[in-house]
Amino acid sequence: MTENSAAAPAGKPKRSKASKKATDHPKYSDMILAAVQAEKSRSGSSRQSIQKYIKNHYKVGENADSQIKLSIKRLVTSGTLKQTKGVGASGSFRLAKADEGKKPAKKPKKEIKKAASPKKAAKPKKAAKSPAKAKKPKVAEKKVKKPAKKKPAPSPKKAKKTKTVKAKPVRASRVKKAKPSKPKAKASPKKSGRKK
Protein backbone atom coordinates (compact mmCIF):
# COMPACT_ATOMS: atom_id res chain seq x y z
CA MET A 1 0.00 0.00 0.00
CA THR A 2 2.84 2.31 0.82
CA GLU A 3 4.36 1.78 -2.63
CA ASN A 4 1.02 2.53 -4.34
CA SER A 5 0.39 5.57 -2.18
CA ALA A 6 3.91 6.83 -2.94
CA ALA A 7 3.45 6.21 -6.67
CA ALA A 8 0.11 8.01 -6.80
CA PRO A 9 1.34 11.34 -5.44
CA ALA A 10 4.39 11.05 -7.69
CA GLY A 11 2.08 10.74 -10.72
CA LYS A 12 -0.16 13.64 -9.74
CA PRO A 13 2.58 16.30 -9.72
CA LYS A 14 3.68 15.18 -13.20
CA ARG A 15 0.20 15.88 -14.52
CA SER A 16 0.10 19.19 -12.72
CA LYS A 17 3.48 20.15 -14.28
CA ALA A 18 2.13 19.32 -17.71
CA SER A 19 -0.91 21.44 -17.08
CA LYS A 20 1.29 24.26 -15.74
CA LYS A 21 3.45 24.14 -18.89
CA ALA A 22 0.34 24.53 -21.00
CA THR A 23 -1.05 27.38 -18.93
CA ASP A 24 2.04 29.24 -17.69
CA HIS A 25 3.26 30.44 -21.08
CA PRO A 26 1.93 30.69 -24.63
CA LYS A 27 3.56 29.10 -27.65
CA TYR A 28 7.28 29.72 -28.09
CA SER A 29 6.61 31.35 -31.44
CA ASP A 30 4.24 33.84 -29.79
CA MET A 31 6.74 34.53 -27.02
CA ILE A 32 9.56 35.08 -29.52
CA LEU A 33 7.42 37.51 -31.54
CA ALA A 34 6.50 39.34 -28.33
CA ALA A 35 10.18 39.56 -27.37
CA VAL A 36 11.15 40.96 -30.78
CA GLN A 37 8.30 43.47 -30.67
CA ALA A 38 9.24 44.56 -27.15
CA GLU A 39 12.88 45.25 -28.07
CA LYS A 40 12.15 47.16 -31.29
CA SER A 41 15.85 47.35 -32.11
CA ARG A 42 16.83 48.52 -35.59
CA SER A 43 19.55 45.92 -35.94
CA GLY A 44 17.18 43.18 -34.73
CA SER A 45 17.02 41.21 -31.50
CA SER A 46 19.50 38.41 -30.85
CA ARG A 47 18.58 34.91 -29.72
CA GLN A 48 20.11 35.53 -26.30
CA SER A 49 18.03 38.66 -25.75
CA ILE A 50 14.90 36.76 -26.83
CA GLN A 51 15.71 33.98 -24.35
CA LYS A 52 16.24 36.50 -21.56
CA TYR A 53 12.95 38.22 -22.31
CA ILE A 54 11.04 34.93 -22.38
CA LYS A 55 12.63 33.69 -19.15
CA ASN A 56 11.93 36.98 -17.39
CA HIS A 57 8.31 37.29 -18.51
CA TYR A 58 7.22 33.65 -18.70
CA LYS A 59 7.66 30.55 -16.62
CA VAL A 60 9.63 28.28 -18.90
CA GLY A 61 11.24 24.88 -18.33
CA GLU A 62 14.90 23.91 -18.62
CA ASN A 63 14.56 22.95 -22.28
CA ALA A 64 13.41 26.47 -23.19
CA ASP A 65 16.65 27.32 -25.00
CA SER A 66 16.39 24.40 -27.41
CA GLN A 67 12.69 25.10 -27.95
CA ILE A 68 13.42 28.76 -28.65
CA LYS A 69 16.09 27.79 -31.22
CA LEU A 70 13.71 25.45 -33.01
CA SER A 71 10.85 27.94 -32.98
CA ILE A 72 13.13 30.72 -34.27
CA LYS A 73 14.21 28.51 -37.18
CA ARG A 74 10.57 27.69 -37.93
CA LEU A 75 9.58 31.35 -37.84
CA VAL A 76 12.44 32.24 -40.20
CA THR A 77 11.52 29.46 -42.65
CA SER A 78 7.84 30.42 -42.50
CA GLY A 79 8.72 34.05 -43.18
CA THR A 80 7.32 35.62 -40.02
CA LEU A 81 10.84 36.47 -38.84
CA LYS A 82 13.72 37.78 -40.93
CA GLN A 83 17.32 37.17 -39.99
CA THR A 84 19.35 40.39 -40.20
CA LYS A 85 22.66 39.00 -38.91
CA GLY A 86 24.30 35.62 -38.38
CA VAL A 87 23.36 32.18 -39.64
CA GLY A 88 20.79 29.74 -38.30
CA ALA A 89 19.42 30.36 -34.82
CA SER A 90 22.46 32.43 -33.84
CA GLY A 91 22.06 35.97 -35.06
CA SER A 92 19.68 38.92 -35.01
CA PHE A 93 16.05 38.72 -36.02
CA ARG A 94 13.31 41.13 -37.02
CA LEU A 95 9.62 40.84 -37.68
CA ALA A 96 9.00 40.32 -41.36
CA LYS A 97 5.74 42.30 -41.15
CA ALA A 98 7.57 45.39 -39.91
CA ASP A 99 10.06 45.09 -42.76
CA GLU A 100 7.25 44.60 -45.28
CA GLY A 101 5.51 47.68 -43.93
CA LYS A 102 8.70 49.70 -44.36
CA LYS A 103 9.63 48.32 -47.78
CA PRO A 104 6.47 49.33 -49.65
CA ALA A 105 7.05 52.89 -48.49
CA LYS A 106 10.58 52.72 -49.90
CA LYS A 107 9.54 51.03 -53.15
CA PRO A 108 7.33 53.87 -54.38
CA LYS A 109 10.15 56.31 -53.65
CA LYS A 110 12.46 54.20 -55.78
CA GLU A 111 9.81 54.02 -58.49
CA ILE A 112 9.38 57.79 -58.38
CA LYS A 113 13.13 58.21 -58.64
CA LYS A 114 13.21 55.75 -61.51
CA ALA A 115 10.32 57.56 -63.20
CA ALA A 116 12.09 60.86 -62.70
CA SER A 117 15.45 59.56 -63.82
CA PRO A 118 14.30 58.46 -67.29
CA LYS A 119 12.80 61.92 -67.83
CA LYS A 120 16.08 63.45 -66.81
CA ALA A 121 17.88 60.94 -68.95
CA ALA A 122 15.53 61.69 -71.86
CA LYS A 123 16.23 65.41 -71.65
CA PRO A 124 19.99 65.00 -71.86
CA LYS A 125 19.48 62.58 -74.73
CA LYS A 126 17.51 65.21 -76.63
CA ALA A 127 20.07 67.79 -75.64
CA ALA A 128 22.79 65.37 -76.67
CA LYS A 129 21.12 64.82 -80.03
CA SER A 130 20.86 68.53 -80.78
CA PRO A 131 24.51 69.20 -79.94
CA ALA A 132 25.40 66.12 -81.94
CA LYS A 133 23.66 67.68 -84.92
CA ALA A 134 25.36 70.94 -84.16
CA LYS A 135 28.62 69.09 -83.67
CA LYS A 136 28.44 67.50 -87.10
CA PRO A 137 28.51 70.86 -88.89
CA LYS A 138 31.11 71.97 -86.39
CA VAL A 139 33.22 69.00 -87.40
CA ALA A 140 32.72 69.95 -91.03
CA GLU A 141 33.61 73.51 -90.17
CA LYS A 142 36.65 72.29 -88.31
CA LYS A 143 37.63 70.21 -91.31
CA VAL A 144 37.15 73.22 -93.53
CA LYS A 145 38.93 75.43 -91.07
CA LYS A 146 41.91 73.11 -90.79
CA PRO A 147 42.69 73.19 -94.51
CA ALA A 148 41.80 76.87 -94.43
CA LYS A 149 44.45 77.29 -91.78
CA LYS A 150 46.87 75.31 -93.90
CA LYS A 151 45.78 77.17 -97.03
CA PRO A 152 46.58 80.65 -95.73
CA ALA A 153 50.26 79.69 -95.69
CA PRO A 154 50.29 78.37 -99.28
CA SER A 155 47.70 80.87 -100.48
CA PRO A 156 50.02 83.83 -100.01
CA LYS A 157 52.66 81.79 -101.80
CA LYS A 158 50.21 81.16 -104.58
CA ALA A 159 49.29 84.81 -104.53
CA LYS A 160 52.97 85.65 -104.76
CA LYS A 161 53.32 83.18 -107.59
CA THR A 162 50.38 84.70 -109.35
CA LYS A 163 51.92 88.09 -108.77
CA THR A 164 55.20 86.82 -110.11
CA VAL A 165 53.40 85.20 -112.99
CA LYS A 166 51.68 88.48 -113.66
CA ALA A 167 54.98 90.24 -113.28
CA LYS A 168 56.76 87.70 -115.47
CA PRO A 169 54.91 88.59 -118.62
CA VAL A 170 55.74 92.20 -117.95
CA ARG A 171 59.34 91.29 -117.29
CA ALA A 172 59.30 88.93 -120.22
CA SER A 173 58.01 91.66 -122.43
CA ARG A 174 60.67 93.93 -121.10
CA VAL A 175 63.26 91.21 -121.56
CA LYS A 176 61.98 90.51 -125.04
CA LYS A 177 62.22 94.15 -125.79
CA ALA A 178 65.69 94.20 -124.32
CA LYS A 179 66.73 91.04 -126.14
CA PRO A 180 66.28 92.39 -129.62
CA SER A 181 68.20 95.46 -128.60
CA LYS A 182 71.06 93.30 -127.40
CA PRO A 183 71.37 91.30 -130.59
CA LYS A 184 71.23 94.57 -132.47
CA ALA A 185 74.06 95.79 -130.33
CA LYS A 186 75.88 92.54 -130.96
CA ALA A 187 75.16 92.75 -134.63
CA SER A 188 76.40 96.27 -134.83
CA PRO A 189 79.96 95.40 -133.77
CA LYS A 190 79.95 92.51 -136.17
CA LYS A 191 78.89 94.82 -138.93
CA SER A 192 81.51 97.28 -137.86
CA GLY A 193 84.10 94.51 -138.03
CA ARG A 194 83.03 93.55 -141.48
CA LYS A 195 83.18 97.14 -142.57
CA LYS A 196 86.73 97.21 -141.36
UniProtKB/Swiss-Prot annotation:
Main location: nucleus
Range of residues in the leader sequence: none
Residue ranges, compositional bias (Basic residues): 104-196
One Gene Ontology biological process: nucleosome assembly
Record's keyword annotation contains Nucleus: yes
Database matches in CDD domains: H15
Region spans: Disordered: 1-29, 78-196
Location in or out of the cell: Nucleus; Chromosome
Name listed for the protein in its UniProt record: Histone H1.0
Organism: Xenopus tropicalis (Western clawed frog)
This protein's encoding gene: h1-0
